[in-house]
C-alpha cells in the first residue's frame, strides 16, 4: 500500500529555496496514460545514473553506480533511494554544493515502461519485471532485490535476454551514447 506521504523523505533532504530541484507540489498532467521512466546521469560526489519508474504518483528510484548495461550477463548494482516527484523526470540542472546530491544532472534516457507482472507485488517480493521503450534503453528488464547489506535496499538491474540485448564486449551503451 502506498504511503500517505510518499515524498516526505525526498522533501526532508532538500531546501527548495536553494536548489532548483522540483518540489513535487505541482502534479504532472499527462493524457497519454503511459507510465514514464527516466535515467538521469548524475555527476555528484561520484558519477552515477538514477533509474526512475513512475508508479503510484511518484518516481520509484534507484542509484546505479555503473549505469545500465544491455548485456544480460552483467548485473548492475541499483541502490533504492527515496521516491521522487513525477516532475523530476524532466529535471536537468546543477544542484548547489553543500546540498544533498550536489552536482550536475542531465536526462540521459526517457520513455515509457510497462510492468510485466503486478509492479507493487514485484517491489514487495523483490523481483520487478518490466519492458522499457525509450530513446536508449528498450526491451525487457529486471530489478532483483539482493541479500546484500546496506543502509538502503540493494537491487540488481539486469537486462533480459531478448532482441534488444547486446554483449558488453560489442556495445557499451554508456560509452556509445554518453549524453
Language model: regions and residue ranges:
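A charge-rich, low-complexity, intrinsically flexible signal that marks solvent-exposed coils, linkers
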Residues: 1-179
Amino acid at each position: 500500500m502506498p504511503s500517505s506521504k510518499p515524498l516526505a523523505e525526498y522533501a526532508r533532504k532538500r531546501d527548495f529555496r536553494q536548489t532548483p530541484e522540483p518540489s513535487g507540489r505541482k502534479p504532472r498532467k499527462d493524457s497519454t496514460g503511459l507510465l514514464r521512466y527516466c535515467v538521469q546521469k548524475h555527476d555528484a560526489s561520484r558519477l552515477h545514473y538514477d533509474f526512475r519508474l513512475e508508479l503510484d504518483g511518484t518516481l520509484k528510484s534507484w542509484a546505479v553506480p555503473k549505469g545500465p548495461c544491455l548485456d544480460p550477463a552483467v548485473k548492475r548494482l541499483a541502490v533504492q533511494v527515496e521516491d521522487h516527484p513525477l516532475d523530476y523526470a524532466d529535471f536537468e540542472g546543477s544542484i548547489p554544493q553543500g546540498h544533498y546530491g550536489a552536482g550536475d544532472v542531465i536526462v540521459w534516457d526517457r520513455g515509457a515502461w510497462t510492468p510485466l507482472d503486478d509492479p507493487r507485488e514485484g517491489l514487495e517480493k523483490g523481483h520487478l519485471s518490466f519492458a522499457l521503450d525509450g530513446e536508449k534503453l528498450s526491451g525487457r528488464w529486471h530489478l532483483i532485490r539482493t541479500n546484500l547489506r546496506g543502509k538502503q535496499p540493494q537491487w540488481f538491474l539486469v537486462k533480459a535476454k531478448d532482441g534488444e540485448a547486446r554483449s558488453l564486449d560489442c556495445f557499451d551503451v554508456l560509452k556509445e551514447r554518453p549524453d
